[in-house]
Amino acid sequence: MFYLLDQPTRNEFQSLARRYENMDPSSVKAAVTLLKTGSDILTGFEKMLKRYGLSQGRFLILIVMNRQPDKPTSPSILAKQIGVTRATMTGLIDGLVKDGLISRGRHGHDRRKQELKLTGKGMGLLEDLLPDYWSRLRKLMGGLTHQEEETLVSLLNKVDAGIPFLTIDNQG
């Protein structure tokens, strides 16, 4: 999460740029605004999910499984699809099974493998949640035209391509 509520002013950014060699005020302002907005969106998203008794991880599992609700899947496939470790996935699955939102069974030919399926209760929860979710996303993006939304996606894809520069050791 990014908790900086009081962002620097234009003059403060300019002052920082004079003090620090690689500080580009425009880039930093854009990145700080993106971090703050993304953090605020995630906070709102988590509050909405909490009303349905879900965390982001549990929601993502249900959403991915809902793409093909009649097709069983495995914990390892789900872990890859939502970007968590298998250990994290085990905890998320245990909670969803306990709440009756998914079922866990054994693979027909390989008893070592687990098969996971959405239950009727899980489908029912999604039927209640998803219209609310879609409506909130529509309102979130309501200030943009469809063309602006497409431009935003294109710009965010460009920013996403630069994420490795946050973690590499050299400053190329």
What is each residue range found by the language model?
Residues T33, L60-V64, G124, T151:
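Pre-recognition alpha-helix immediately N-terminal to the DNA-recognition helix
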Residues M1-Y52:
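N-terminal leader segment of winged-helix/HTH proteins
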Residues D94-T151:
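Charged, amphipathic alpha-helical coiled-coil/dimerization segments
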Residues M1-N22, Q147-G172:
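C-terminal regulatory/oligomerization modules of transcriptional regulators
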Residues P25, S39, T43-T85:
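N-terminal helix-turn-helix DNA-binding core of bacterial DNA-binding proteins
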Residues P75, I93-D94:
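Short, hydrophobic-biased segments on the C-terminal half of alpha helices
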Residues L35, I63-D70, L130, N157:
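Short, locally clustered residues in the helix-turn-helix/winged-helix DNA-binding domain
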